[in-house]
């Protein structure tokens, strides 16, 4: 189940998933509920959405979406690429800012936006990370960041994690 305003890269990933797809109206939890109600309760489901939609500047109703995921036994996958390094007490993103880190199953982030480097990551339980590494060609046929980029990313994360002033300036742009 995908928010209609998800980033093109997310939509492309969903297309490659070779599974039934349902698109819900942007940030419309009532529409999402209707779709979830129509599905077999025993069927695996994942709700895919962004925390912050950069094109129109709005935030997802993360807590409400997580509540629906709990109610309908669905997984949650959140794209925090426009939020990490910018929001939260340590730059962990909108979920950190709202105290919802423990409510989301899979996080997607980037080192290319606020951190100014290159590369991306997922954060999830060991079980999910191992499954993604095993079945996702994008992870199987890629290489790790070179040490110089990993060091630059580490430095950027440390700076933004500890300097709320810089994060605030980014938010005000």
What are these regions (language model features)?
Residues 22-78:
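Active-site phosphate-binding strand-loop segment of PLP-dependent enzymes
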Residues 17-19, 98:
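Glycine-rich tight-turn/loop motif centered on a GG-T
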Residues 8, 29-30, 51-56, 83-87, ...:
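Short, small-residue-enriched loops and turns at beta-alpha junctions
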Residues 1-6:
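Conserved PLP-anchoring active-site segment centered on the Schiff-base-forming lysine
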Residues 8-17:
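Active-site-proximal loop->helix
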Residues 72-75, 82, 87-173:
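Active-site C-terminal subdomain of aminotransferase-like
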């Amino acid at each position: 189940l995908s928010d209609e305003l998800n980033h093109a890269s997310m939509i492309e990933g969903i297309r490659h998933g070779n599974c039934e797809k349902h698109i819900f109206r942007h940030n419309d939890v009532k529409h999402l509920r209707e779709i979830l109600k129509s599905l077999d309760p025993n069927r695996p489901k994942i709700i895919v959405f962004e925390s912050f939609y950069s094109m129109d500047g709005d935030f997802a109703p993360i807590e409400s979406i997580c509540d629906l995921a709990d109610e309908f036994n669905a997984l949650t996958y959140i794209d925090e690429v426009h939020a990490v390094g910018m929001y939260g007490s340590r730059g962990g993103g909108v979920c950190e800012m709202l105290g919802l880190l423990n409510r989301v199953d899979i996080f997607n982030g980037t080192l290319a936006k606020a951190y100014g480097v290159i590369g991306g990551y997922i954060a999830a339980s060991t079980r999910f990370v191992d499954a993604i590494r095993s079945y996702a060609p994008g992870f199987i046929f890629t290489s790790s960041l070179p040490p110089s980029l990993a060091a630059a990313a580490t430095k950027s994360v440390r700076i933004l994690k500890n300097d709320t002033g810089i994060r605030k300036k980014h938010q005000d742009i």
